[in-house]
């Protein structure tokens, strides 16, 4: 379900995932996807930081996918470790950050907004 600007949108169904990507492709919006898992300690550590980035950057679409909940999406995107952050624009992968690396996450977003 889509939420307000400046929030992380959790994709609980493949349909929601596809809808969000479609909208982002049409608007040429930068998308940052957090592939996460409920049991993943580093994922829980970085989640508040990811949410804070979403508040600070309302012109970027922040999505969250639980790899256990949407196994097919995680498989399609070849997710091997959590957290993995994918940076997408117009349906293309621009970049990827693996691990709870705050500085790298922030600098990669800045790079693709420049």
UniProtKB/Swiss-Prot annotation:
The modification N-acetylalanine is found at residue 2. Coiled coil: none annotated. InterPro entries: Thioredoxin (IPR005746), Thioredoxin-like_sf (IPR036249), Thioredoxin_CS (IPR017937), Thioredoxin_domain (IPR013766), Thioredoxin_H-type-like (IPR050620). Pfam families: Thioredoxin (PF00085). Residues 2-114 form the Thioredoxin domain. GO terms for molecular function: enzyme activator activity; oxidoreductase activity, acting on a sulfur group of donors, disulfide as acceptor; protein-disulfide reductase activity. The record marks 34 as: Deprotonates C-terminal active site Cys. The record marks 41-42 as: Contributes to redox potential value. Disulfide bonds join 40-43. GO terms for cellular component: cytosol. It is found in: Cytoplasm. Keywords: Acetylation, Cytoplasm, Disulfide bond, Electron transport, Redox-active center, Transport. The keyword Cell division does not apply. The active site is at residues 40, 43. GO terms for biological process: positive regulation of catalytic activity. Interacts with FBA6. Interacts with MDH1. Thiol-disulfide oxidoreductase involved in the redox regulation of a number of cytosolic enzymes. Activates the cytosolic malate dehydrogenase (MDH) probably by reducing an interchain disulfide bond of the inactive MDH homodimer. Possesses insulin disulfide bonds reducing activity. Belongs to the thioredoxin family. Plant H-type subfamily. PANTHER family: THIOREDOXIN, THIOREDOXIN H1. This is Thioredoxin H1.
């Amino acid at each position: 379900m889509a939420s307000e600007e400046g929030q992380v949108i959790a994709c609980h169904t493949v349909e929601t995932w596809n809808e969000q990507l479609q909208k982002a492709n049409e608007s040429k919006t930068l998308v940052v996807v957090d592939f996460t898992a409920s049991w993943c300690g580093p994922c829980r550590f970085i989640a508040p930081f990811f949410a804070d980035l979403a508040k600070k950057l309302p012109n970027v679409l922040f999505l969250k996918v639980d790899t256990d909940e949407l196994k097919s999406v995680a498989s399609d995107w070849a997710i091997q470790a959590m957290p993995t952050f994918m940076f997408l624009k117009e349906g293309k992968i621009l970049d990827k950050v693996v691990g709870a690396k705050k500085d790298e996450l922030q600098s990669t977003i800045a790079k693709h907004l420049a």
